[in-house]
């Protein structure tokens, strides 16, 4: 047990999200999202986007694997909602770039910078993704890139600028996004109400 635990710890990295201008959480909470349900729309829209990108790569011959079932699933747990896709997935480097750096640079710079860039492979994934923190104490991304030999990773963050990322086993490509412990729901709401 202990040896296994040690291995896990040694492959886990902690870091701070690169906050270059203002931290994006207050921006998101205040301006972008007055509507709680929007986070679910955002996460599903990210999942659909990742799926479309995989289809595109397959159609131009850049993805040669089995495309298979591309349904986006939303499943409810007691304290979680999981949005799962079998799209392009993310590598640790992409998480670092799109989640840790871009999404936390000022929202305005970010929107300015990417609004005309159709080629940003993961587009504005980060911004919509962070809307999940409006309702959850912690958010996890469990993902495996479509790239051959890619290592699956799990990223988690509790809404502070600190995150952890670790290597995990995941058989299939794609991404699960799991907002955990819904702190910000109104008293009478449960995950199911969303």
Question: Which residue ranges define each predicted feature?
Answer:
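Conserved small/polar residues in nucleotide/adenosyl-binding loops
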Residues: 1-7, 183-190
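GHKL (Bergerat-fold) ATPase N-terminal catalytic module, capturing the glycine-rich phosphate-binding loop
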Residues: 6-182
């Amino acid at each position: 047990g202990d040896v296994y635990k040690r291995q896990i710890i040694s492959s886990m990295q902690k870091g701070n999200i690169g906050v270059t201008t203002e931290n994006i959480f207050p921006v998101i909470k205040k301006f972008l999202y007055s509507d709680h349900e929007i986070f679910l729309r955002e996460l599903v829209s990210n999942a659909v986007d990742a799926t479309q990108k995989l289809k595109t790569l397959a159609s131009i011959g850049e993805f040669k694997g089995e495309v298979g079932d591309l349904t986006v699933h939303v499943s409810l747990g007691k304290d979680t909602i999981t949005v799962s896709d079998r799209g392009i997935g993310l590598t640790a480097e992409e998480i670092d770039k799109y989640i840790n750096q871009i999404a936390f640079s000022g929202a305005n710079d970010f929107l300015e910078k990417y609004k005309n860039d159709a080629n940003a492979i993961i587009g504005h994934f980060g911004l919509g993704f962070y809307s999940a923190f409006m309702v959850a104490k912690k958010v996890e991304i469990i993902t495996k890139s479509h790239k051959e030999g890619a290592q699956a990773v799990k990223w988690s963050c509790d809404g502070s600028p600190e995150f952890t990322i670790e290597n995990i086993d995941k058989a299939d490509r794609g991404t699960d996004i799991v907002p955990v412990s819904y702190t910000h729901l109104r008293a009478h709401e449960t995950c199911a109400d969303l």
